[in-house]
Amino acid sequence: MSKQQAQFTNPETPGYVGFANLPNQVHRKSVRKGFEFTLMVVGESGLGKSTLINSLFLTDLYPERVVPGAADKIERTVEIEASTVEIEERGVKLRLTVVDTPGYGDAMNCVDCFKPIISYVDNQFERYLHDESGLNRRHIVDNRVHCCFYFISPFGHGLKPLDVEFMKALHNKVNIVPVIAKADTLTLRERERLKRRVLDEIEEHGIKIYQLPDAESDEDEDFKEQTRLLKASIPFTVVGSNQLIEAKGKKVRGRLYPWGVVEVENPEHNDFLKLRTMLITHMQDLQEVTQDLHYENFRSERLKKGVASKVENVEVTKDQILQEKEAELRRMQEMIARMQAQMQIQSQSGDAQHL
């Protein structure tokens, strides 16, 4: 048998076709193409959003910001800043876009502060819809927001009115993951109490947050347990730090206090590792929910509005045609009346001449 023939012999048992290798083909294609993911972070200044994002992806994506003073907050407006970075790990490329919202919740009057954020989300849907409807659909860049980390202050007793308004305004457009920031300012008991309070208020106000899918029945027990723990950890209480400090003879990222060290990646100290695990293991699901639920809802609404406007235009056109015909009929009637009047005058003048 030649080498060429040997390459096409069936290495498996008789009756094996080879469909089982399809997932490997999809995996290889996906790895070559790379992955795209857009994460939005929303919350008041001073909650450590930039630090947490840098800690999550081990990159200096965002510089540390100066927290604005009281005078600066009076007329503070919300800005939208999108930063993209290419991350490669073991041959797998991730095009990560992080959308930051500096100024959110900082002004004295925060009534409309989330409207620029909603406009940004809708604009990304609109852009994707436009590209998807175009001729060149092979190289569409997906800038839709796949996930939103919403940062909740640890210094309150639950959700603020602004938190409720924002999440209710956005929960049908984006996968919202609530995050309680600066967990190192709370005791373990205070964390659990605040978590329960936030979850109760989320349910009370009918806010839809991202629901982690249940593990399949054929998944191994470790994955099922991991899924159970991740679900039980929502909202995640996290600590972020980019500083390496020495603890128990090893270098760790954390925060040093007079009473000890808070380690960022220690699950006994905070939920940082759980949050990162959730994001990495459910990145595909977050994208699918964005595509199948949020984007489809947006697309359906746009199509309905398009059809409604066309029907309205048709009705307007019919009314215009009818009005034009009525006007033309009136003009003809007036013209006939004038002609009859002229004929009558001519007839009367002719009779007078005969007399």
From Swiss-Prot:
Region (G1 motif): 43-50
One Pfam family in the UniProt entry: Septin
Stretches for region G3 motif: 100-103
Annotated region (Important for dimerization), positions in chain: 259-269
Localisation per UniProt entry: Cytoplasm; Cytoplasm, Cytoskeleton; Cytoplasm, Cytoskeleton, Spindle; Cleavage furrow
Family: Belongs to the TRAFAC class TrmE-Era-EngA-EngB-Septin-like GTPase superfamily. Septin GTPase family.
InterPro entries per UniProt: G_SEPTIN_dom (IPR030379), P-loop_NTPase (IPR027417), Septin (IPR016491), Septin2 (IPR008113)
Gene3D superfamilies: P-loop containing nucleotide triphosphate hydrolases
Keyword tags: Cell cycle, Cell division, Cell membrane, Cell projection, Cytoplasm, Cytoskeleton, GTP-binding, Membrane, Mitosis, Nucleotide-binding
Residues under site feature: Important for dimerization: 155
Subunit structure: Septins polymerize into heterooligomeric protein complexes that form filaments, and associate with cellular membranes, actin filaments and microtubules. GTPase activity is required for filament formation. Can form heterooligomers with other family members and form filaments. Interacts with wdpcp.
Protein name (record): Septin-2B
GO terms of molecular function: GTP binding
Entry keyword annotation includes Nucleotide-binding: yes
Function: Filament-forming cytoskeletal GTPase. Required for normal organization of the actin cytoskeleton. Plays a role in the biogenesis of polarized columnar-shaped epithelium. Required for the progression through mitosis through regulation of chromosome congression. During anaphase, may be required for chromosome segregation and spindle elongation. Plays a role in ciliogenesis and collective cell movements including convergent extension during gastrulation.
SUPFAM superfamilies registered for this protein in UniProt: P-loop containing nucleoside triphosphate hydrolases
Superkingdom to which the source organism belongs: Eukaryota
